[in-house]
């Protein structure tokens, strides 16, 4: 299950009573699996600070989730033909995502609760902002390397009209170091092989008789050599084109051929060298982002609960995993359980279907319910596809 509901309701006499009432209400029809979602005693601050922070946390939530999904998506791209291993590489704090979420514990070392809520939000914003910036740099460099390699590899394949010819020809195919003669490479459609063999010597004067040789062919074309005097090369190219024979620009140079092969080898080596460290970086920083995202959710629950239920802080946060096809019934059950929290609830009993936004009551939420509610979708692969 990839969808989780993070809710909170005020403590009755104790938070444990609220927890037991929730379990009792959802247990009857196995509507959901419920887990306590522990949020530490954070610094409350003033009401004005909470209202301002509520809106900012909504934006931070969207930003951190976006970066988390970007990291997951790019990890899938980098894995290429190993993409089926993406799921096992997406972990949080060395745990799978559902287990981390259902056993959530606040990270006191990274986000000290002695800090104000605003400072904790700023710590997360800077942390994830840096990851986002680093991702842009790393992905840009790796994509450039991959793009250069793909371009070179494309030139090694494809049609004879466009592909690199260096690996198809040999030194003996060419007249080299002659003051008067040169060898051209000509692409001839397969259907015109006979025409070429019968007429290439007549395309211009000064063509060496019986100098043509078929050195390679693909499904559509053949690669022929022809030797002629340098002074008629331009004329030959013009008349060859009129007959649908294409002269490829090519100068045989041993050093250039070796350099070309070395470039591909170097790019392949560089890609392999970068692959491992990049995958490790993406895995580590996916974990960082995901954990930060869930801490933002915890902050939002805390702030919204204080704004809704008042002081002293007394609420029970819970993580619900709706059973398959029971979301509607679970929503109805929660509404019945908590409708008393909202004096105007009888005016919008169908809020769960209509996603009504009540100005001044939702504190940045697009859906309003009598209880604090945030949806968490941890399916990174679906949205990363």
From Swiss-Prot:
Keywords: Hydrogen ion transport, Ion transport, Transport. Subunit of the V1 complex of vacuolar(H+)-ATPase (V-ATPase), a multisubunit enzyme composed of a peripheral complex (V1) that hydrolyzes ATP and a membrane integral complex (V0) that translocates protons. V-ATPase is responsible for acidifying and maintaining the pH of intracellular compartments and in some cell types, is targeted to the plasma membrane, where it is responsible for acidifying the extracellular environment. Subunit C is necessary for the assembly of the catalytic sector of the enzyme and is likely to have a specific function in its catalytic activity. Belongs to the V-ATPase C subunit family. This is V-type proton ATPase subunit C. The keyword Plastid does not apply. SUPFAM superfamilies: Vacuolar ATP synthase subunit C. PANTHER family: V-TYPE PROTON ATPASE SUBUNIT C. GO terms for molecular function: proton-transporting ATPase activity, rotational mechanism. V-ATPase is a heteromultimeric enzyme made up of two complexes: the ATP-hydrolytic V1 complex and the proton translocation V0 complex. The V1 complex consists of three catalytic AB heterodimers that form a heterohexamer, three peripheral stalks each consisting of EG heterodimers, one central rotor including subunits D and F, and the regulatory subunits C and H. The proton translocation complex V0 consists of the proton transport subunit a, a ring of proteolipid subunits c9c'', rotary subunit d, subunits e and f, and the accessory subunits VhaAC45 and ATP6AP2. InterPro entries: ATPase_V1-cplx_csu, Vac_ATP_synth_c_sf. It comes from Manduca sexta. GO terms for cellular component: lysosomal membrane; vacuolar proton-transporting V-type ATPase, V1 domain. It comes from the Eukaryota. The keyword Secreted does not apply.
């Amino acid at each position: 299950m990839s969808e989780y509901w993070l809710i909170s309701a005020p403590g009755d006499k104790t938070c444990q009573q609220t927890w037991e009432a929730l379990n009792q209400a959802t247990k009857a029809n196995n509507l959901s699996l419920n887990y306590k979602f522990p949020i530490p005693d954070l610094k409350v601050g003033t009401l004005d600070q909470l209202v301002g922070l509520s809106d900012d946390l909504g934006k931070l939530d969207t930003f951190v989730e976006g970066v988390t999904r970007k990291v997951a998506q790019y990890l899938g791209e980098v894995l290429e033909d190993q993409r089926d291993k993406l799921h096992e590489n997406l972990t949080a704090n060395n745990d799978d995502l559902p287990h981390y979420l259902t056993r959530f514990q606040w990270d006191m070392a990274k986000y000290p609760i002695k800090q104000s809520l605003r400072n904790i939000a700023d710590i997360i914003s800077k942390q994830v902002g840096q990851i986002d910036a680093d991702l842009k740099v790393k992905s840009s460099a790796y994509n450039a390397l991959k793009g250069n390699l793909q371009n070179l590899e494309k030139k090694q394949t494809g049609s004879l009209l466009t592909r690199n010819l260096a690996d198809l020809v040999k030194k003996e195919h060419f007249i080299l170091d002659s003051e008067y003669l040169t060898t051209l490479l000509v692409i001839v459609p397969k259907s015109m092989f006979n025409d070429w063999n019968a007429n290439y010597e007549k395309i211009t004067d000064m063509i060496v008789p019986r100098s043509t040789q078929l050195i390679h062919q693909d499904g559509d074309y053949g690669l022929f050599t022809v030797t002629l005097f340098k002074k008629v090369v331009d004329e030959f190219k013009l008349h060859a084109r009129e007959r649908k024979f294409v002269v490829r620009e090519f100068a045989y140079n041993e050093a250039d051929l070796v350099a070309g092969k070395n470039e591909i080898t170097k790019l392949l080596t560089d890609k392999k060298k970068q692959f491992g460290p990049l995958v490790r970086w993406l895995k580590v920083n996916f974990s960082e982002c995901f954990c930060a995202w869930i801490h933002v959710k915890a902050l939002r629950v805390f702030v919204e609960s204080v704004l809704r239920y008042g002081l002293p802080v007394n609420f029970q946060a819970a993580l619900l995993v709706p059973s398959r096809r029971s979301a509607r019934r679970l929503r109805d059950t929660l509404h019945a359980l908590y409708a008393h929290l909202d004096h105007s609830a009888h005016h919008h009993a169908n809020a769960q279907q209509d996603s009504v936004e009540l100005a001044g009551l939702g504190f940045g939420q697009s859906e309003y319910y009598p209880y604090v509610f945030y949806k968490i979708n941890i399916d990174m692969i679906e949205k990363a596809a």
